[in-house]
Regions:
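Conserved beta-strand/loop scaffold segments within soluble protein domains that form the structured core
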Residues: 58-60, 66-203
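N-terminal amphipathic, basic helical "cap/leader" segment at the start of enzyme domains
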Residues: 1-104
Length: 203
């Protein structure tokens, strides 16, 4: 069973955030392939983020997308930077810590995740994608995805999640909050590849 006394709630990866894919650890690259996300598709994405355990290790967004005012960044950067007020307005308002015990746990120990804002009237014709790999044995991953699609805008967002198989329990307790304003459209897709030792308790 799941014993929280044996789950590490924060594991720092042994690499820093990278903006060049060739600098990302090989096992993350290999897992992208196993998830069925080929090189050609990655090149056609509007932006890609990759989290390894508790922190993002890779993030990149196309200049043309950023030029339209689209914000795609990691949650830590968003809440510490110029988007802090927007994050505070929406963070854990759809899913509150009072919903259930795993929502409360997530609210207490969350780390990593993606923040996306698409301005009014902006239509992204190619998707943004975030990938979350829980690599540490006996650990939990608590990423938070917050997406706001403003009036008349549109977005396709893809998330992928996976972890190695271990003989001890791991926990994935991420949270996704999606705000779609009047006349806006959001297509949200998730690809998950878990083994039997993983407790996947997303909210």
């Amino acid at each position: 069973g799941l014993d929280m006394d044996h789950i590490a709630t924060y594991v720092r990866p042994n690499t820093k955030m990278r903006n060049d894919w060739k600098d990302v650890p090989e096992d993350i690259k290999e897992t992208f392939e196993r998830l069925g996300i080929p090189q050609a598709e990655r090149k056609s994405l509007a932006g890609v983020g990759a989290q390894y355990d508790s922190e993002l290790v890779y993030h990149n967004v196309k200049d043309s997308v950023a030029a339209e005012g689209v914000v795609y960044t990691d949650m830590e950067s968003a809440i510490k930077g110029e988007y802090a007020d927007m994050v505070r307005k929406y963070f854990m308002k759809l899913v509150t810590p009072h919903d259930h015990k795993f929502a409360a746990l997530h609210g207490a120990v969350w780390s990593g995740g993606s923040f996306v804002y698409v301005p009014k009237g902006v239509h992204l014709s190619i998707p943004l994608q975030s990938y979350f790999r829980l690599n540490a044995k006996g650990a939990g991953q608590f990423e938070h995805t917050l997406i706001i699609v403003d009036e008349g805008a549109s977005l396709h967002f893809i998330e992928g999640c996976s972890a190695p198989k271990y003989n001890v329990a791991n926990l994935h307790a991420g949270c996704v909050e999606l705000y779609v304003k009047k006349g806006a459209k959001l297509r949200y897709s998730t690809i998950e590849n878990w083994s039997k030792n993983m407790y996947n308790l997303n909210t």
